[in-house]
From Swiss-Prot:
Its main location: membrane. Belongs to the Lgt family. This is Phosphatidylglycerol--prolipoprotein diacylglyceryl transferase. A 1,2-diacyl-sn-glycero-3-phospho-(1'-sn-glycerol) binds at residue 139. One of its GO terms (cellular component) is plasma membrane. PROSITE patterns: LGT (PS01311). GO terms for molecular function: phosphatidylglycerol-prolipoprotein diacylglyceryl transferase activity. It is a multi-pass membrane protein. It comes from the Bacteria. It comes from Pseudomonas fluorescens (strain ATCC BAA-477 / NRRL B-23932 / Pf-5). Catalyzes the transfer of the diacylglyceryl group from phosphatidylglycerol to the sulfhydryl group of the N-terminal cysteine of a prolipoprotein, the first step in the formation of mature lipoproteins. The lineage of its organism: Bacteria, Pseudomonadati, Pseudomonadota, Gammaproteobacteria, Pseudomonadales. It is an enzyme of class 2 (transferase).
Amino acid sequence: MLPYPQIDPVALAIGPLKIHWYGLMYLIGIGGAWLLASRRLNRFDPTWSKEKLSDMVFWMSMGVIVGGRLGYVLFYDLSAYLANPTLIFEVWKGGMSFHGGFIGVMLAAWWFGKRNNKTFFELMDFVAPMVPIGLGAGRIGNFINAELWGKPTDLPWAMVFPPFSDPAQLPRHPSQLYQFALEGVALFLILWLFSRKPRPTMAVSGMFALFYGIFRFIVEFVRVPDAQLGYLAWNWLTMGQVLCVPMILGGLGLIWLAYHRAPAKSAAQ
């Protein structure tokens, strides 16, 4: 069994102001995505300035934050937030939905593209390889918060999470680290290498949706579902898996369309 590193969720406290690691992970993810996007900016559109890139990253980041929070409220715990709406704003306590954030990013991409003469999939293909940076950083934030841990296990890398998080004090799968490895590291490598060469429009977006959906679906088997939802069916199906099914099918559909439709301008990522 591996020891769980005791890390204070508050990274810095200045008087009443508290800066949480969870929030810092979002900033690190957004900053890392911007740096990587700036490296490929000339390949995407030589006429774009760093300022325009920053504008795009800003609006997509707003889509992640607002969509992620609203997605969690709608998909995972609607009744609790209806009973106490002020809880919606307590984002430092966790409670973000990837699928909600993904919808938020798509809406931001559509809106920004309409105003900058870019199609929806041109922007999505460009940003997709950068998204795993934010996903990986977010999973580290989950780990520091000692949330979203896995089922009990006797594997040698099991961890006992703090009593405030897991009163049962059982050795568990560190499922946040599994997701960091798959959604952050593995997905980044797949998309970064795949997009090094020009690909048909929609291909990179399809790869992102497909592999994220697969990775998340797999990890959900060892991750404990949200207590207020539990399993939706068969004592194993979770809300996360249900939301991943359309991503997997949509990803396959996008890849098929990208390579079988009439020839179109290739997207150089």
